């Protein structure tokens, strides 16, 4: 294969000096370094054209426009070789035709069908070609050979694939139009044996009749199969094949017209003659393959293979282009010659198939395109749009809007039981929805609602109250069953004392009970719910009243709400000197929500600044209008310390109870009520303060309160005396429970221990399932990001232990309601009732992070304290709730990362700059304000703009002495570490970062 032409070769070819060629290339705008440099083929072609134009010789002919079509059919010429003069003299060239694009010989017929167009003209040119023109054409052919060789394989494959498509949709032959090919020979004369006319390396070309002209033998100068035709005819080499019989001398072969019709889209309307064979007559291949000549043309309907073509300098038998394929079922083409192929050399040019082509082998049709056509963009887009994710049929039933009731934390197995389905099918449905849930795992409410909506069911999550009611119904226990009137007896009223902290609620109860409870309360504030029963003479009768004392501190909101739910009447205590306060309004709202009557006790009227009328005016704004103002609310002025107005208050309570309420309850039957408070006693175990609402509770009864159960071992009143039985509205302390119940849990007595144990176990299981479902939630991207952020936060881990469950609950709620920044978080690992035990210390020490144990009104034993010291666990004790809240809040803020702010120290002006090879530039400065300190942060200002920031004062001296700091008005010398771009007049500003207090 020919390489790129060098400058000296071009100069030798053009007959000029190399420097002339270099100058010409420079004039053309091409950069060439020396005479040995190579030149690309297009540049070489332009160079030759330029020299030809300068010398007056004609350049290679450009393809002229096609001549208009004529009625008479003219043969389509073969390739367009530039005719060279024979040894005997110059030959006449034909009129130039559009040259074929340089490329490899096409191993088959023309890819596309016959295109109607103007016929080719074979008029010979009048001017013979000169020897110089031949040399120019030969050199140009060599230059185009490289590019043509690279495109040869692609062109051949494309032509074969196009031929396969055109075989199907080929139209009836019409007059041959112009097609790229070599220029015709000297004249239109029939081919003769041994003539240089060679078959085109392709199949038959549609034409109306026999072709009359021959083909010049040369395909390019120097037998280049990819070059521009114009080489000189060479004598046939030995072994290249002798003269072939002409089409006229051969007997006619069966043509498509004489054959029975074959099924094809075009229905074979006419004969497709071979090229350049005779009309419809197949032949073994017209024209011998000659050195320098094209391949022999294929035959007709079942024509023979084409002859071998000559190479550029092919030896005997060296084929140029592949021999022309056969006709309708043409034979294979002859071997193609190489660039400098030896005997029989060159690459074999596969014979182009005619209409029908060669037979398909084991690996498909040779040279054909793949059987599966390329899809259009629109078709691929439609297929992509029609794609859908594969769905697996789970077999789960589909609902029609039926309602399914599920408890909190229900599993997929529970759901499957409700709709009579297989739990595995629901697991698969959740998998299709993107949720990984097992059949027995507790699911959140959102997950159950999502699955129900997907299956067509309406899921209703049962509330805790309804859930407990359904649980008791399984044991034939109905808390709301109606009671016959003959079983009802009157019961004492239950009165709850509520109000703001330090307004004298407990002191008022002490005055009523004639006791001193305030002295026993830590900090003088109530932190428990106290239940007492007092007897008051009224209308010559001994009337019993049950009082419930609730805390007034803001942390005990749940306790106040619980007290309002179990009460009949609320006494709202308001201090006459303070007036209405926030917890007063909250207690008022609790009472209204419980729909119970309110009696207002205006306390502390004995103080000098007391103003009872102000209290009445303030409460009027909240809907409590005094009777003296025309309302229906009783206001009583009392003073708890001297005991003023106590009798009037009790009388108002009894009058309200008799006038507004019908207080009756059955005394027979199992006891039912509410656990107001519970705690863990060291000597007596779990102790619960219960208020009986129905029936009678006796010692030895089996009771269940929340998740705790047991048998009543003893009952105590508010004074510590044992009680044999407790009727309605009677508060007692119950001993004998297996665990500490939660404050506010309902209790009931049952016939045997087995029933209460099953109820307690099912309550505990449902609570655990609900807690697990709520803690897990749905795993979404948002929750995942929140968990990742939470892992980066600093957390304060606590273990809460208190004396009663209500206090622990209040402390936990207060801590979670603290307004703390997002950088820190509060985690309560465990909470419980009772003293601090070794288990609490072991739990705290086993945690990966530091855990603090908070003891609220409880202490740790000596052995437990020693273990905590050994394990490094901190224990803190508190007796007042707001003190615990304040210290824990301070600890949370102490975990915050410190924030720093910039504080300016001073400024200095640069008066002189000294160069030093040892330390760099030394700035001679005078301190204008503040002070300069060694190792302080600094920034350099020039004309009011910051030139450099975050610098450090490396050294600081006064005269020759090192200085730690230099104050205002003094001169100094300093260096900025790692920075030397200091100029006279610059300002050095020093600052430091100080920690800012977090709010």
Curated annotation (Swiss-Prot):
Region entry Disordered, spans: 50-407
Keyword Secreted included in the entry's annotation: no
The entry's keywords:
Cytoplasm, GTP-binding, Initiation factor, Nucleotide-binding, Protein biosynthesis
- In which residue ranges is the amino acid composition biased (Polar residues)? 388-405
Q: State what this protein does.
A: One of the essential components for the initiation of protein synthesis. Protects formylmethionyl-tRNA from spontaneous hydrolysis and promotes its binding to the 30S ribosomal subunits. Also involved in the hydrolysis of GTP during the formation of the 70S ribosomal complex.
Tell me which HAMAP family the record gives.
IF_2_B
The protein in question is named: Translation initiation factor IF-2
Organism source for this protein?
Answer: Salinispora tropica (strain ATCC BAA-916 / DSM 44818 / JCM 13857 / NBRC 105044 / CNB-440)
| Designated gene of the protein | infB
